[in-house]
């Protein structure tokens, strides 16, 4: 079986989210797509999979609507369903920072293309922050990146208030899996008064796709939020499992986090 997996998001003022939810639910069901779509007044965040023709038709119909015109998305070919079912939900935020009043559609950090990221990493004045959660960072990251030690994205503002703002850095560069978290985090940092904020365009996955393994600076694997669990520097799927007891990604038969024996699992308990 050959399927196409797409991931996309956009911060855009979105009215009548319930109407959009029903339309997307009906469209995806008719096309036989699986995955998750989150809608909020701040925009859309989605990961979907289906056959090539169905994905192409979905994107064509979606982009006919002004809020989603010229939508950027990442795609990958997978051999099995990365999602078990379809979920279309309305939430207060498409990625939960706990700041629904924040408006990333108006102001975010400067996007840095993958081709320019390595040069930025060499700037000693840049404070590099991995915006992901600690269990994701445990699998891999960029050298010298700060781990905020968060268990969820909503913890990030506390890290900023307690660790970053007492001595505000002149420049901050941030990255995450696909770009959405660092885009929203960059809006938060700008609101807190940090003047120069950079974000990796398209996130780690875009960087790994654009930069050859012998030239990229990524170390380890990258956690992804589907049944692949993680990808390596070549965007191949290593043999990670999710511990059924604590939900952490592991490669051994015993979970190093909770010491429980690991049976093959594709979703947290």
Curated annotation (Swiss-Prot):
The active site is at residue 176. Keywords: Oxidoreductase, tRNA processing. It catalyses: uridine(34) in tRNA + AH2 + O2 = 5-hydroxyuridine(34) in tRNA + A + H2O. It is an enzyme of class 1 (oxidoreductase). It comes from the Bacteria. GO terms for biological process: tRNA modification. InterPro entries: Acylphosphatase-like_dom_sf, Rhodanese-like_dom, Rhodanese-like_dom_sf, TrhO, TRHO_N. The keyword tRNA processing applies. GO terms for molecular function: oxidoreductase activity, acting on paired donors, with incorporation or reduction of molecular oxygen. Residues 122-216 form the Rhodanese domain. Its EC number is 1.14.-.-. Belongs to the TrhO family. Catalyzes oxygen-dependent 5-hydroxyuridine (ho5U) modification at position 34 in tRNAs. PANTHER family: RHODANESE-LIKE DOMAIN-CONTAINING PROTEIN 7-RELATED, THIOSULFATE SULFURTRANSFERASE/RHODANESE-LIKE DOMAIN-CONTAINING PROTEIN 2. This is tRNA uridine(34) hydroxylase. It comes from Synechococcus elongatus (strain ATCC 33912 / PCC 7942 / FACHB-805).
